[in-house]
Structure formats: structure tokens, C-alpha cells
């Protein structure tokens, strides 16, 4: 019988956050590809575009005018997925629970990260920009909105912060921006994750799990996981870390270059719990991760990035108390700047069993985390920033 080798043989990996298995098929990256490909072109965008509805001072589609902002700018989304309208819920459970409907109320906001149209988070790490000067204000805006929205809107239970970067992820405008959705319910995935965290802490079998403890003195799922990854021989899945946060490829990753950013020194439930030093650490690691992404294939790396944290203070129950702040990066690229991974077929048909096919090997036969770590050994100067690209063309 052939000895099992995870780097070569199909297998399943357990995702303890969602309590599902992920099917890993490392040999699949060797198949020939004649499918769709993304453009690798990097257009030289201007710092200001008079037709952009996110640039400072410009008029949006509704006629509202943007402030002449110089750092971050937040406004309520006029084309929101949710509306702040209170409606009377009706009892629709009259068909054996098969046709249930529940009203969804909320507010949506747009967060412009920077006034310059041609910047990304990744490019804010390279001179004349810096994480201290240009990314910290973004985190301050996130924190302020988390606190302000919950204080001003008692119906809100959960605030989802996220960014879709690049046309491959459905982004309709290249101007650096993210979104905030304030919901009157806790979404399915954050609820599952909170439940998993609570159950891990409450399970007596985990009493001696390593890592920092929850404020109630119990072990914590992600803090224990971060501790074990940081103490694994060679740290094979750790991408980078600083004084407060670690960026790593999750053991159960679905996307080839998926990354999770999480604290490893102490329990942080939400942005409200951060010290200024921790905000600085988060700014630096976000800048580093996104910069390394771009440098990997020398392209503006597309991704969806989202923050999981506690529900708003007035909506916190016993489950919410165990929610740990962490960030997910889901980039679609597979083996180059032009070939992406698609979640189709088997993934959709067996979603209850697996989240996808984890490609543990890249085109050169080494795992994605090793590709990233190899690239991360280089300086974190951004190779596709406007300044660097102009210099390289001279």
C-alpha cells in the first residue's frame, strides 16, 4: 500500500470554524488549462478622475457631492442592498416551514480609503506612502463606524466590514474603497463561527489547549490554533507576523492563496477593544499582506477581504462573548496573474461536505504558503505602485 502523503494524495481537512470538511486535491494543478483567463494588464490610472463617483469633490449618481476629503471619507450608500425601513413581520410559517420569509433591515456605507484614484491598500506601504500615515486612518474609520452605527441604530445587531478588490471579484470602481453593512441580524457564517468558538471553550477536553485565554479564563479556538501554528516546526503556514498579529494560510484553506489575519497575544473581540499600538500593528500587517500579494505575480492581486468580530455591544449574548476579531482574505488567483480558481460543480453540489478543492501545489510544485513565504523574503517595497512602475519604465 502506498504511504499517504498530504502533498500528493487527495484528502479532507477539517475546518473547525465552520465545522465542515474541505476536500484537498493537490494533483489538480497539474492539469492543462484552456479556460478563461484574467487580464494581467496594469493600467496607469490618474490620481484624480473627474468621472469617478468616489473621487474628492465629485458628484455621485444621485446628485450628492463628495467632500473634498484628504484621508478617508465615509458616506451612506445610495444603492444599498438593505434599507433602513421598519416593516411588520408576518407569520409566514404556514407551509411546513418551506416558504419562510423574514424582513431584513439595515444600512450600508462606502468607505473611501484614500483620495487618490490610483492607489490600493498594498500601494500604501511604499514611499511616499506608509501604513502609519495612510492605513491607520482607515482602521480608525472602521472602528468609529462600528461604534457610531451601533450607538445610533438600536436595531443593528451586526456590522460587516469588507472590501472587494479588482474586477475579478466584482468591484465596479478601482478607486480604493470598502463597504460597511449594518444588519438587524447576525449573518449565518459569523453565527456558525461564534458557536464553534463557544463550544471549543466550553468543552472540558480542551481545558489544556495552548495559547492565551479568553477573559473568562477558558481556552479559545483561534488563539490555540495561532499558538500551534507559531510553534510548528518551520512554521510552514505562517506568512508573516508582528508584535500583535499573525498572517497565515489556514490549515483548512479553500483558496490557493487564502490568508487569515488574527491576534496571537491576547483576546480581541472587536475593533473597540484595540489599543492604538494594536491598531498600528494591524495597519502594518494589512499593508504587508496586500503588498506581498501584489508582488507575488507582479499584478494588482484581486481578493475579497472581510472582518469577523463581535456583534455590536447591545446584541452580545453568551455566544458573542467568545467571538474573536480576525480577517479573511479570499483571492481567486490560482497559478499566475491570469489563471483564477472557480468554485463550481462539485463544490456547489456538495457544499454541506466541502468548501472546495484546496490546491496545495502551485505550477512549480511547491505549496502556496511556501510560494508566499519565498516571496515574502524579499523587501516589501511594492513593485506595481505608480512610483515604482514609472521608475521601472525609465
Positions of the model-derived regions?
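Active-site microenvironments that recognize anionic phosphate/pyrophosphate groups
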Residues: 1-175, 181-271, 277, 291, ...
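Gly/Ser/Thr-rich active-site loops/lids in small-molecule metabolic enzymes
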Residues: 279-285
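An acidic, glycine-/histidine-flanked metal-binding catalytic module
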Residues: 286-290
Amino acid at each position: 500500500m502506498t504511504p499517504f502523503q498530504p502533498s500528493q494524495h487527495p484528502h479532507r481537512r477539517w475546518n473547525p470554524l465552520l465545522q465542515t470538511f474541505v476536500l484537498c486535491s493537490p494533483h489538480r494543478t497539474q492539469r492543462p488549462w484552456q479556460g478563461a483567463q484574467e487580464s494581467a494588464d496594469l493600467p496607469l490610472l490618474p490620481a484624480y478622475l473627474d468621472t469617478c463617483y468616489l473621487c474628492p469633490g465629485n458628484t455621485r449618481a444621485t446628485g450628492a457631492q463628495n467632500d473634498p476629503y484628504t484621508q478617508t471619507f465615509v458616506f451612506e450608500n445610495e444603492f444599498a442592498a438593505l434599507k433602513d425601513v421598519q416593516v411588520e413581520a408576518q407569520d409566514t410559517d404556514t407551509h411546513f416551514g418551506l416558504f419562510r420569509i423574514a424582513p431584513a433591515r439595515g444600512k450600508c456605507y462606502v468607505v473611501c480609503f484614500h483620495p487618490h484614484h490610483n492607489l490600493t491598500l498594498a500601494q500604501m506601504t511604499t514611499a511616499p506612502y506608509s501604513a502609519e500615515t495612510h492605513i491607520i486612518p482607515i482602521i480608525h474609520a472602521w472602528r468609529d463606524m462600528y461604534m457610531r452605527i451601533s450607538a445610533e441604530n438600536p436595531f443593528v445587531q451586526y456590522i460587516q466590514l469588507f472590501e472587494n478588490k479588482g474586477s475579478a471579484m466584482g468591484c465596479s470602481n478601482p478607486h480604493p474603497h470598502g463597504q460597511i453593512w449594518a444588519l438587524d441580524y447576525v449573518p449565518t457564517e459569523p453565527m456558525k463561527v461564534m458557536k464553534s468558538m463557544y463550544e471549543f471553550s466550553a468543552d472540558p477536553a480542551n481545558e489544556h489547549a495552548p495559547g492565551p485565554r479568553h477573559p473568562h479564563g477558558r481556552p479559545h479556538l483561534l488563539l490555540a490554533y495561532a499558538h500551534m501554528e507559531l510553534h510548528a516546526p518551520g512554521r510552514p503556514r505562517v506568512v508573516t507576523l508582528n508584535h500583535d498579529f499573525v498572517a497565515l494560510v489556514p490549515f483548512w484553506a479553500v483558496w490557493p492563496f487564502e490568508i487569515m489575519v488574527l491576534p496571537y497575544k491576547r483576546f480581541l473581540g472587536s475593533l473597540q477593544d484595540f489599543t492604538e499600538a494594536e491598531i498600528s500593528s494591524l495597519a502594518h500587517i494589512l499593508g504587508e499582506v496586500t503588498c506581498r500579494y501584489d508582488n507575488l505575480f507582479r499584478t494588482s492581486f484581486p481578493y475579497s477581504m472581510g472582518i469577523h468580530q463581535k456583534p455590536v455591544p447591545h446584541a452580545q449574548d453568551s455566544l458573542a462573548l467568545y467571538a474573536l476579531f480576525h480577517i479573511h482574505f479570499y483571492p481567486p488567483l490560482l497559478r499566475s496573474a491570469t489563471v483564477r480558481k472557480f468554485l463550481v460543480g462539485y463544490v456547489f453540489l456538495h457544499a454541506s461536505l466541502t468548501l472546495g478543492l484546496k490546491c496545495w501545489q502551485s505550477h512549480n510544485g511547491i505549496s502556496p504558503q511556501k510560494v508566499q513565504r519565498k516571496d515574502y523574503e524579499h523587501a516589501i517595497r511594492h513593485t506595481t505602485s505608480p512610483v515604482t512602475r514609472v521608475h521601472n519604465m525609465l
